[in-house]
């Protein structure tokens, strides 16, 4: 009897220990995620749980609420969260304040080589990797085929352009002028020849000086002296202002309003993100085509295209850094997860093996193939600075003031002084 009791006790102890071990092994990680992707992210997290036993709990927020939650929770040192989506221009700011964990120990050089170079650069602060890219954005030049045909423009020329043979901004303006003379000769129809989807915004407008070899900000991220007061920026700002004065580009229309002009047949050419295609489908718009982003004449080898989207990082205050980093690596840097996300969401990948696969697939749509080429060759990240909010505010004003006819030299001088004043606090 004693032997039986001893045996039962031993079995119970082993069962208890096994249960305890299982509880110890099962991890739960909390992810500050965006509501727009909640369904797709849940599918990915469920797959990760099936494979690893690690449960990912999503807390989904709208864009503004997510940014605020990150500032309020992670910014004050909360240990309740492990993983977060990061709007890429904020990586440096978060890293500087200790809000992101260094992922360098978890991503080898071989791993990083599998990610788009510009995206890795945008996630690197002081030589360390603080987030890993999950999705990307790119630019194409859209044009309204019906308007151009009505204006007597031969579409064959536009159809012949590519990433190897780009239309120049100068030629683009010539075609736009020619079309406007037919479509809106006296300027009473409210037609626009060419414009940027995100007019007045640093994300897209900086593509102009960048495409002449201009840089975004000083190496330390805190100065615009030696940046704005250089030939690329002066030429780009002057060129843009001239197009506004001539009536080729618009004035007084906001970035949120401008795409509507393309949908409604009031805008002939629009430089926009690849995500615009989904909007065209929703609007039942069929009279459009696209080509590669333009180059400035004489600067064909300097083409730079706006890029950057969502990256994934680990909270600097997570109590599960290693497990969280493993998840980040899985979701952003493996064949399985990146292909799943692409199939679910259709966004431009940042995982090079998948980009190569799509580029060689005859079923990949044309705009995606353009985006793949730009991502690998011309993508140029936004300013890498902890002071990005201050930077974007100042540079947005530069573009807006230039558009409204302010003196370019005076605008540049103001911006240099204003940014210097706003970044003093970062140097203390």
Labelled PLM ranges:
Residues 2, 6-9, 18-96, 106-112, ...:
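Conserved N-terminal structural module of periplasmic/extracytoplasmic solute-binding proteins
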Residues 22-30, 49-54, 124-127, 179-190:
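Immediate post-signal peptide segment of exported/extracytoplasmic ligand-binding proteins
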Residues 126-134, 139, 165-225:
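Extracytoplasmic/periplasmic solute-binding protein
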Residues 173-177, 220-253:
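Glycine-centered hinge/linker elements that transmit conformational signals in sensory
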Residues 291-292, 342-399, 426:
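Long, aromatic- and glycine/proline-rich binding clefts that accommodate carbohydrate-like moieties
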Residues 27, 51, 55, 246-248, ...:
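Extracytoplasmic/periplasmic substrate-recognition and gating elements
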Residues 86-140, 149, 170-171, 187-190, ...:
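Hinge/lid segment of periplasmic solute-binding proteins
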Residues 104-115, 158-166, 187, 192-194, ...:
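Short, solvent-exposed loop/beta-turn-alpha elements that line the ligand-binding surface or hinge
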